[in-house]
């Protein structure tokens, strides 16, 4: 049996055991070590891959699933008209090259992102900025590059900084007051900020007409989530995806921009382009996504305008998954949420006591990557899991730690 087949069998077995909910503790040290080694060989990285120095100073970098300062607290039930929760209790990320020759994905995490982005901007300009009270919002993003990694890496460096600038400008301009009108205005401001951010970053990385042809053929999808105490804002451009688990139900927060999506096909054709079925539906027979950052040579058919979803948080919100199509091409929303939920609720911790992080968001992300590999994903695979409230009780955690 080949090593690839053996690896897929081990991953599939692990996933089946978690789905079955088998809580019996066996002698698993060897298999656990083997799974860890397999992930390392595949090039596993955790949320520390967000290499921005400012972000590292703001958030813990010692654990791939770094808990926030509120991670030891159970998210409170809403007690007022405008409910507030911790932005997140933990987050984790895994990004692997998979069966591709080159790594073109990039991920970024900054929590809280406004403070991290402010520090990065001040360092870049050399100008000191007054301290201000920023809302505790986390920034999470997956960028799936194509034609090379240049644009995805540029998005990782710039997207959160530009978005923070756009958000601050609109908050400075907003008026006082309260009520439904203000809430609606705030939603509109978030959509405007996201749209302006994507346009600016696209302008920075898209390449000019006189630029080298190679630079014009590089692009990246982008799915970005800003998680705050009151709401979740998701902006998507391309076929990466964001899915929320709410009360055990998978709720998509984005819609893939595929060339054969009826409204996207109509838009492309109205701009003078064509959607050709050449090894799958593609813009001009070339690109399998109808929106992206970069890809100057395919404009105006391929645009960088994101679709933005602004959703109020509830006490049923459990976790958020952001991932590239390396996961979504082989795993459905429902299955992904079931796997992550079982992991975060403690089933994986009792089954795999030597797990690197102990049934945290990073473990959930790693298990989803294993599942995608076992199902034959041929792409880079990047997964970010954001835990919004504790699914595992303190009693369960104490028993496991004292075992």
Curated annotation (Swiss-Prot):
Gene3D superfamilies: PPM-type phosphatase domain. Residues 62-71 have a biased composition (Low complexity). It catalyses: O-phospho-L-seryl-[protein] + H2O = L-seryl-[protein] + phosphate; O-phospho-L-threonyl-[protein] + H2O = L-threonyl-[protein] + phosphate. One of its GO terms (molecular function) is protein serine/threonine phosphatase activity. InterPro entries: PP2C, PP2C_BS, PPM-type-like_dom_sf, PPM-type_phosphatase-like_dom. Its EC number is 3.1.3.16. Its cofactor is Mg(2+); Mn(2+). Keywords: Hydrolase, Magnesium, Manganese, Metal-binding, Protein phosphatase. GO terms for biological process: regulation of intracellular signal transduction. It is an enzyme of class 3 (hydrolase). Binds 2 magnesium or manganese ions per subunit. Mn(2+) 2 binds at residues 144, 325, 379. Mn(2+) 1 binds at residues 144-145. Residues 90-388 form the PPM-type phosphatase domain. Residues 42-80 are annotated as: Disordered. The keyword Manganese applies. Belongs to the PP2C family. This is Probable protein phosphatase 2C 8. The lineage of its organism: Eukaryota, Viridiplantae, Streptophyta, Embryophyta, Tracheophyta.
């Amino acid at each position: 049996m080949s090593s690839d087949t053996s690896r897929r069998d081990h991953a599939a077995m692990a996933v089946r055991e978690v789905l079955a909910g088998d809580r019996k503790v066996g002698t698993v040290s060897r298999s656990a070590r083997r799974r860890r080694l397999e992930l390392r060989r595949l090039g596993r990285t955790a949320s520390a891959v967000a290499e921005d120095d400012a972000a590292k100073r703001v958030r813990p970098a010692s654990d791939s699933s770094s808990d926030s300062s509120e991670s030891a607290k159970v998210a409170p039930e809403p007690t007022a008209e405008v409910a507030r929760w911790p932005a997140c209790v933990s987050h984790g990320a895994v990004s692997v090259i998979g069966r591709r020759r080159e790594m073109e994905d990039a991920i970024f995490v900054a929590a809280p992102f406004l403070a991290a982005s402010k520090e990065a901007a001040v360092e870049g300009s050399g100008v000191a900025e007054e301290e201000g009270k920023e809302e505790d919002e986390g920034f999470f993003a997956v960028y799936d590059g194509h034609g090379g990694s240049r644009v995805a890496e540029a998005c990782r460096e710039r997207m959160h900084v530009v978005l923070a600038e756009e958000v601050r400008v609109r908050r400075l301009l907003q008026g006082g007051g309260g009520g439904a009108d203000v809430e609606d205005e705030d939603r509109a401001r978030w959509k405007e900020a996201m749209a302006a951010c994507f346009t600016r970053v696209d302008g920075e990385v898209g390449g000019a007409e006189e630029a080298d042809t190679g630079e014009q053929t590089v692009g990246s999808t982008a799915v970005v989530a800003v998680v705050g105490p009151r709401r979740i804002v998701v902006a998507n451009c391309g076929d990466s995806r964001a899915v929320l688990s709410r009360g055990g139900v998978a709720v998509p927060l984005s819609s893939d921009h595929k060339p054969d999506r009826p409204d996207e096909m109509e838009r492309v054709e109205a701009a003078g382009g064509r959607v050709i079925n050449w090894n799958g539906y593609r813009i001009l027979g070339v690109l399998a996504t109808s929106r992206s950052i970069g890809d100057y040579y395919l404009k105006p058919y391929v645009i960088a305008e994101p679709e933005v979803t602004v959703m109020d948080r509830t006490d049923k919100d459990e976790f958020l998954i952001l991932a590239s199509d390396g996961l979504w091409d082989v795993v459905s929303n429902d299955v992904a949420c079931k796997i992550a939920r079982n992991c975060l609720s403690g089933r994986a911790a009792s089954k795999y006591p030597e797990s690197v992080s102990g049934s945290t968001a990073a473990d959930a992300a790693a298990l989803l990557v294993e599942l995608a590999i076992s199902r034959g994903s041929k792409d880079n695979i990047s997964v970010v899991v954001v835990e919004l409230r504790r699914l595992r009780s303190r009693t369960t955690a104490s028993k496991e730690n004292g075992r």
